[in-house]
Design a protein with these regions (language model features):
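Structural micro-motif
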Residues: 103, 114, 121, 125-126, ...
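Thiol-/selenol-based redox modules, centered on thioredoxin-like
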Residues: 130-185
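Short loop/turn microsegments at loop-to-beta-strand junctions
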Residues: 16-17, 39, 138-140
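N-terminal targeting signals for export/organelle localization
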Residues: 1-20, 185
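Structural microenvironment flanking redox-active thiols in thiol-disulfide oxidoreductases
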Residues: 56-116
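Short active-site neighborhood of thiol/selenol oxidoreductases, capturing the structured segment around
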Residues: 29-59, 74-76
Length: 185
């Protein structure tokens, strides 16, 4: 495990790639919808049997830490848009007791989603018929600031961590701390 500088200021990794998808309420949501907000991006799918339930339980904890914060949001982007329709995402959101109006479960064009994940965010997603669930992806969360820049801590060697581990308590706690930092910037 890399040791991460607990008090490090957040560095800027780069601009968030542009995206535009449809959320669980059938509204068009783009990166511009989050202008002026601090937000977190993840890639998941509703029928994921392994890491997604852990990721979204942790994301719910993050949501609950910022329930009254109108300048905070979450973009949960499905990598199985053929199955994860607006209706399916709406039901899924209920399962996780999504009450923060800025938590958007997003679906859209398959190729756009895969390009966004693999090239835009450098977060691997892929179809993998041999694995349970049929898709592969990482458990990482990406933090974006009010100006649309990807932000992160640095490790003890001064290298950016870039992503937060959405499967580990430590990663989630760091993310909550860093969201607070950005909201106060």
């Amino acid at each position: 495990r890399k040791s991460i500088d607990k008090d490090s200021k957040l560095i800027t990794i780069g601009e968030v790639p542009a995206f535009q998808f449809i959320n669980q309420n059938n509204d068009t949501i783009s990166n511009r919808s989050f202008a002026g907000k601090v937000y977190v991006v993840e890639f998941f799918f509703t029928t994921c049997p392994s890491i997604c339930p852990i990721m979204n339980q942790n994301m719910k904890e993050i949501q609950n830490a910022f329930l009254d914060e109108k300048n905070f949001g979450i973009a949960s982007i499905t990598i199985n848009p053929l199955y994860d329709t607006v209706e399916v995402l709406k039901e899924y959101a209920k399962t996780y007791e999504v009450v923060q109006p800025n938590w958007h479960f997003l679906t859209g064009n398959h190729n756009e989603i895969y390009t966004l994940a693999n090239e835009g965010f450098n977060l691997y997603v892929g179809e993998a018929p041999e694995v349970e669930g049929g898709f592969e992806h990482s458990g990482f969360f990406t933090l974006i600031d009010q100006n649309g820049n990807i932000r992160s801590r640095i490790d003890a060697n001064g290298n950016p961590i870039i992503y937060y581990d959405g499967l580990e308590k430590e990663g989630v706690e760091m993310l909550i701390t860093d969201i607070k930092k950005l909201l106060n910037e």
